[in-house]
Amino acid sequence: MAASLQAAATLMQPTKVGVAPARNNLQLRSAQSVSKAFGVEPAAARLTCSLQTELKDLAQKFTDAAKVAGFALATSALVVSGANAEGVPKRLTFDEIQSKTYMEVKGTGTANQCPTIDGGVASFAFKPGKYNAKKFCLEPTSFTVKAESVNKNAPPDFQKTKLMTRLTYTLDEIEGPFEVSSDGTVKFEEKDGIDYAAVTVQLPGGERVPFLFTIKQLVASGKPESFSGEFLVPSYRGSSFLDPKGRGGSTGYDNAVALPAGGRGDEEELQKENVKNTSSSTGKITLSVTQSKPETGEVIGVFESIQPSDTDLGAKVPKDVKIQGIWYAQLE
């Protein structure tokens, strides 16, 4: 920013325009004396003065343009600096988000956030009964992957990662039956909604790990302080996806290894590349209620999910991905 302001200040300096040297002025005065002696009008003097006036006007225009350009440059530097200093947007309530226009939300990061609750109690205060959970939202705040440590002789552990995906990883608009039993236990079944998102993270060593963040077909039960369950993790790639050699699960080549007949292409080391596996796997999630507001039907909490990563259609061994974050729902 300092460099931008310095450049702007430099642009605002008046432009220096060269003037005629003293020798030319002396010649001009001599010509004027001769003209007066013979009664001749000094046209050359008028031409020289006119030229100097035009040069001064041109220099003034350049100076004004430089000032305008410098001010614009300085202003843009301040705007960029302010934008970078904003950071994470303030978390809003559901009603506050609904009151925003598209242009007010665009580019702020609010669309990737789950709502919060204004007021309420720090516990699960809903009476026993059958409810319908709507607007169920899960927002990850941490992605860790279980992998070999960068330090020697260290066992595999969950390592911090760098997010390579844009802010499109939040699950939202999920709904399903939510039951509160008389003994205080709860049960939730996921039925519909935006229940998956493709995410890619990068390990400290540079390896990138893609996975499908999801809670498809989740059935979670337990106490409100900690209710958990398993869910379905579909294949990251579909059966119609073709690899660089044109091989796929339901289309493409069966065998892309150019070898004579004899079964060489179906050997064990090549089978996992030739035979695509699109089978699903399972993951487990634990949710905890931290605050609720019965008068509006809102409830929020935190979650921790562990699920497998992408297998490249069966060619790679999946890694365990731990996802931690917050969740929000409305019970009706």
Swiss-Prot record:
First-listed, main subcellular location of the protein, grouped into a coarse class: plastid
Record family assignment: Belongs to the PsbO family.
GO cellular component: chloroplast thylakoid membrane; photosystem II oxygen evolving complex
Lineage: Eukaryota, Viridiplantae, Streptophyta, Embryophyta, Tracheophyta
Chain's gene name: PSBO
The keyword Manganese appears for this protein: yes
Superkingdom assignment: Eukaryota
Function summary: Stabilizes the manganese cluster which is the primary site of water splitting.
Biological process terms in GO annotation: photosystem II assembly; photosystem II stabilization
Region Disordered, annotated ranges: 262-282
Keyword Hydrolase in record: no
A single MF term (Gene Ontology): oxygen evolving activity
Protein source organism: Nicotiana tabacum (Common tobacco)
Pfam families named in the record: MSP
Name of the molecule in the record: Oxygen-evolving enhancer protein 1, chloroplastic
Keywords annotated in UniProt: Chloroplast, Manganese, Membrane, Photosynthesis, Photosystem II, Plastid, Thylakoid, Transit peptide
